Curated annotation (Swiss-Prot):
The keyword Amino-acid biosynthesis applies. It catalyses: 3-dehydroquinate = 3-dehydroshikimate + H2O. This is 3-dehydroquinate dehydratase. Its EC number is 4.2.1.10. It comes from Streptococcus thermophilus (strain ATCC BAA-491 / LMD-9). The keyword Nucleotidyltransferase does not apply.
Amino acid sequence: MKIVVPIMPTSLEEAQALELSRFEGADIIEWRADFLDKHSILTVAPAIFEKFAGFEIVFTIRTTREGGKIELTDGEYVTLIKDVAAIYSPDYIDFEYFTRKEVFDQMLEFSNLVLSYHNFEETPENLMELLSEMTNLTPRVVKVAVMPKNEQDVLDLMNFTRGFKAFNPEQEFVTMSMGKLGRLSRLAGDLVGSSWTFASLDNTSAPGQVALADMCRIREVLDAD
């Protein structure tokens, strides 16, 4: 199970001040570019990609439609993704599939898409259908993050992940229940076929994230013979 650490600089100065040594144990860096205004993203990008050249990088613009910090038209969203991809070739590109379906055809040139769905309110009853639709598109990664209201929601997500992975062994899935209630899904995702877990340094990018140092220790225990 790979550990992903989000970074959320709000300025070039904050990006330059990130201390590389603090990310020891992380496998992937997710750059949450939505903490910048749209005109600053390309200005800050060189600092991010140079500093974290030794890591895999996920480029993410999480818009307000799915719990993020920036409002963009479909055109602005696609243009920013394509501009960053053309210059820096991030290892993964996050795409908010269900809120941007109308422009998904403009993403077909990318083989490294993380098709994502985020719901900070609930675990929807049609979660299986959502997983199925994204899986059928065979992206690099299918990512789902939902909010549980009870323990059964957490178990349902984990069970669905296990089932989809069993029937689609070549597809990478990244799934999590958010908040304290859903923390188990972040710790035991590898058991059911979720390839990544997200951990934090100072600030979390989603409810329920575990600190990087703690997650590294947990992974060490789980991976031990």
